[in-house]
């Protein structure tokens, strides 16, 4: 058996990635989220495939085909809600995974980090297009509002929007192409995930201390396979609690009304995992400025390795940086709350303050505090 595992062309790739992989001996539960993201992706592809068997990408039948899946298909309701809430779990794990990377300085593995940012953008695009497919009110108006942002691009904006729509408004052509992209993108995500792992295994994983673990490695199996299974079990418990007890908790009631181009919902808002970026977008009165702030709010992750001024890699022994990190987390939670509120006083002012704080923390305060900590440690 050992010979097959280590010598077979396919098996030895699996062996070197998941079985005999040398892993740091001290990585904590914050390192579980990579495998949980893999599990979420697998779940999304499987449930998505079964949904695609019954879904019709046509404006006249899309809404009723989703209702048909929930009412008439065997276990269709659970497949649909696993897929919808699976996206929420995916983003929850994704945000924690990125947060862990920021806290423990994993961004110094630049290739892995940059592919991770590309993955984040791809997953966000996939989730946005998936939200359009049920063709409810929020699907239609969400698609209209978000695609319309591209019209802020000078000179080519309007043409670009109409090109994406496939006409002069969000209609049948838009729905069909969104379904096509929503179907193909997860497989592109799988390819990017393999690249992400490839670059990670070139350098080896980081650890909570931020030091080299070359002198103290343990095999991935059985230690971390068992540890990942525990994380997976907890995720399944959380997921099934959500799906079986309150599947619509994170959804929008407006999406149970069929899309109507003549009736605008009072508050157009995306799913909860986009609200922080949506709040940043809305906090700038200028359209182009808002779009740039929206893009930069995520693209800012790419310059974090440049902004890293600390002599220590991890924040584990840097209490001042820890304070700023948790302030950033709180700020993102405030932005998420603001993104779901109507555009009126005092929410506009809170959103603007939180947006300014977000960029100030990352671009100015964190690098400054890192330099102060270097001085305090006489480094």
UniProtKB/Swiss-Prot annotation:
Its cofactor is heme b. One of its GO terms (cellular component) is respiratory chain complex III. The keyword Mitochondrion applies. Binds 2 heme b groups non-covalently. CDD domains: cytochrome_b_C, Cytochrome_b_N. A ubiquinone binds at residue 201. The chain crosses the membrane at residues 33-53, 77-98, 113-133, 178-198, 226-246, 288-308, 320-340, 347-367. It is a multi-pass membrane protein. Coiled coil: none annotated. InterPro entries: Cyt_b/b6_C (IPR005798), Cyt_b/b6_C_sf (IPR036150), Cyt_b/b6_N (IPR005797), Cytb/b6-like_sf (IPR027387), Cytochrome_b (IPR030689), Cytochrome_b_C_euk/bac (IPR048260), Cytochrome_b_N_euk/bac (IPR048259), Di-haem_cyt_TM (IPR016174). The cytochrome bc1 complex contains 11 subunits: 3 respiratory subunits (MT-CYB, CYC1 and UQCRFS1), 2 core proteins (UQCRC1 and UQCRC2) and 6 low-molecular weight proteins (UQCRH/QCR6, UQCRB/QCR7, UQCRQ/QCR8, UQCR10/QCR9, UQCR11/QCR10 and a cleavage product of UQCRFS1). This cytochrome bc1 complex then forms a dimer. Belongs to the cytochrome b family. PANTHER family: CYTOCHROME B. Component of the ubiquinol-cytochrome c reductase complex (complex III or cytochrome b-c1 complex) that is part of the mitochondrial respiratory chain. The b-c1 complex mediates electron transfer from ubiquinol to cytochrome c. Contributes to the generation of a proton gradient across the mitochondrial membrane that is then used for ATP synthesis. This is Cytochrome b.
